[in-house]
Amino acid sequence: MRVLHILNELRPSGAETMLRAASGLWHSRGIQGEILVTGESFGEYAPCLERAGYRLHHLPFERSPLYLWRVFRFLGRNRFETVHIHCERANFWYAALAFVSGRPRVVRSVHGIFAFRGWLRCKRFVQRYVLRRALRTTTVAVSPTVQRVEWMSYQNPSLRIPNWFDSDRYHPASREERAMARRGFGIPDNAIAVATVGNCSPVKNHLAVVSALGSLPRPWRVVYLHAGCEDSSREEARLAERMGVEARFLGAVEDVRGVFAAADLFVMPSLHEGAGIAALEALGAGVPALLADVEGLRDLRDVADCEWTAPDPDAIAAALRRCFERNPEALRERALQASRRIHENFSVVRGASEYADLYRSGTGARP
């Protein structure tokens, strides 16, 4: 069975890491995955997905009828049994083209919170209605918050298949692995390593973490590790330098297990999330975590015993002080308990199996 996944540029973020983690299970169930990349370039994560067994295609997005014609021809030439749309941009048009080209199943995963306003909200309302009623598209929400926002904003019913993380890869590190990782990043034994993971877009709010770290009293020696792409301005790095924060900006990291092994605390200060994969990975790896009490991340409260904060610098600084003042062994024991619950609830087997069943059945939540 051939399944086409449609994404923007491939980066080491949620949907892409989920696809990599699920490739083995899907292959064992006779599902061959291919990816249509619609960004300007394939993206830095493309080689990783190719190694996982995906065949990649590239049609850079353009706002023109000619682009839609190219996508239609591509779909017509390839006999995909299912088309799975992961991007918000042009999702309606991809679903419509898949439908008219005769693809029997169209699945659209909503990976983020899209509470648009004004004219765009009206437009998306109509599009989602047509997707559901006329184009027979199955909508999947990746978290309770996403499912609620889709219903409240667009009256759009959806299945809920939770995001997953690579539960075979992210496990608590041994003492030896932890010591090796800290040496690799040059972290002294007496330092507290605080880690963030993800691109440096405004919604990820990493500037607030840097500001909070810069305001902490100097008795604590803190090393800030960031794995993920910075934007061209390198605003986070420049702020860290101005505020005297000892930082390691690592750029895109294909495998962040080493970052988690070295970390004493993982921080996710996002303004909102669909379902934060990096948080699942860190919690699955047994790292004590400080999460922003915001939509998307809040869905983890029932399963993750961790610290919570408002996403502003002052609140983050106060939460960091609380974490640093606590017994580190007690924090790590709580994190190990959270790791077990995360593995139970967000394993790749659970989520990817539900999608495999959906691909084969073609059924969904339709009124």
Feature names for model-found ranges:
Residues 236-251:
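Nucleotide-activated donor-binding/catalytic signature segment of Leloir-type glycosyltransferases, i.e.
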Residues 36, 288-291:
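Short hydrophobic beta-strand element within catalytic cores of glycosyltransferases
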